[in-house]
Amino acid sequence: GSVFQDPNSQFFSSELAGEVAFACENYGMAREEVRSRTDAAIQTFSLEHLRGRSLDVLSRGEKQRVAIASVYALRPGVYVCDEPTANLDGEGSEQLAETLKKLKAEGCTLVIAEHRLAWLSGIADRFLYLDGGRILWEKSPVEMAHMSEGERETYGLREVTQAPVPDLPRPESGAVFIRPEDVSCKRKG
């Protein structure tokens, strides 16, 4: 099954259950089988709280999990993901990693095209670098962790490990945290 970089481009329904059920219905599965697979996929990826909400109002991370659940309902053995963390924040990337770890634990094969590497820790068994449809090199997770910054930059790859995020103090309730002044925005064209 394929999971696109932008989940909106693969949605055919405006709500969760309809989206997850779509591919099963398209394959002509019996109504009860569609319902069973839809419910199982929604439960497996902890999406129950999104039932009844429009897909348009979901976060990028939630949409990505819906896209994966939609593919999961078909129970493929292989998942191909095109830059699944594109436009996800740290939390969304962590949720996606947990989702993909579930699939890996079930014995699924994951093929992930990605230049952000840190979130793949514990998921990737090997890394391949492709250029023009050809494999230029293959590395283990240990070899990737020891790749120099210069070599990584040569290939357009990001950090292999997650940079620590400082624990910043939270402002008091009602306090001004950021005060923009003299802000302007200009768009080309």
Language model: regions and residue ranges:
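Hydrophobic anchor residue at the start of the ABC signature
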Residues: I68
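H-loop/switch region of ABC-family ATPase nucleotide-binding domains
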Residues: E114-H115
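Conserved ABC ATPase "signature" region
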Residues: E32-L50
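Catalytic Walker B motif of ABC-type/P-loop ATPase nucleotide-binding domains
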Residues: Y79-D82
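Conserved beta-strand-loop-alpha-helix hinge in the C-terminal portion
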Residues: R134-G156
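Conserved ABC ATPase signature
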Residues: S54-L58, E62
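Helix N-cap at the start of a conserved alpha-helix in ABC-type nucleotide-binding domains
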Residues: G90-E91
